[in-house]
Regions:
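Helix-to-loop junctions at the C-terminal end of transmembrane segments
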Residues: 98-112
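A late C-terminal transmembrane helix in Major Facilitator Superfamily
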Residues: 170-190
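Pair of pore-lining "gating" transmembrane helices in MFS-fold secondary transporters
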Residues: 45-63, 146
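C-terminal ends and interior cores of transmembrane alpha-helices
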Residues: 122-135
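C-terminal membrane-cytosol helix-exit motif in multi-pass small-molecule transporters
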Residues: 3-26
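Intracellular juxtamembrane helix-capping segments at the cytosolic ends
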Residues: 154-167
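Short amphipathic helix-loop junctions that connect adjacent transmembrane helices
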Residues: 69-85
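Juxtamembrane intracellular "pre-TM" segments in multi-pass secondary transporters
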Residues: 18-53
Length: 190
């Protein structure tokens, strides 16, 4: 893993141009005055696209967390080994992150709302596949959890892009913070 991290660092250092850190330092930063968080929340509340974006992110996260957390427990009840459980969760994580660039490109090509819809449909399919799988059927659970991760990726990436497009520049950071808060509270409550 250290070798992979070192290689990734070298690739990023060589090919990431322009450096986002340097670009950010050159641009003027809009600072929110005290009380502007309330204005940002009001801006989101009055913006149907922003609300839809945050809702889709939260729904995707609740579905993902609920199924992801319970699957290892379900498998352990019939004495599936930790190695197999770990493999199923690894396949899930692959679904969450491996196709992120593709999901972003699809979001640009097909539109944010369409990719969110695809994500919700994928999440629904994943719960059906996982829900009907036997606890010792690692293959079917792996497929279900892969789809779960992929659906989550679709709702999160397209939802975040839609949110960013839907709010004024002055409210982008506060809106993303509100989205993260809602997403994580929803996941904890789900």
């Amino acid at each position: 893993s250290a070798t992979t991290l070192a290689l990734a660092t070298i690739v990023i250092a060589m090919f990431l141009r322009p450096d986002p850190y340097l670009v950010a330092n050159k641009e003027s930063v809009t600072k929110l005055a005290k009380g502007d968080t309330k204005k940002a929340l009001k801006h989101i509340r009055n913006n149907p696209k922003a609300l839809f974006a945050i809702l889709s992110i939260a729904i995707g996260h609740v579905a993902m967390v609920s199924v992801m957390v319970m699957t290892p427990v379900h498998m352990a009840h019939v004495d599936v080994t930790l190695t197999v459980i770990g493999l199923v969760i690894s396949i899930h994580v692959l679904g969450m992150y491996a196709f992120s660039p593709l999901v972003g490109a699809l979001s640009d090509r097909l539109g944010r709302i369409r990719v969110i819809q695809i994500g919700i449909a994928t999440l629904l399919l994943s719960t059906i596949v996982s829900g009907f799988a036997r606890a010792d059927d690692a293959y079917t659970l792996g497929v279900g959890l892969f789809l779960l991760g992929l659906g989550w990726s679709c709702t999160l990436i397209a939802g975040s892009a839609l949110l960013s497009e839907s709010v004024e520049s002055a409210f982008k950071a506060s809106s993303q913070g509100a989205s993260d808060l809602v997403m994580n509270l929803s996941g904890a409550a789900g």
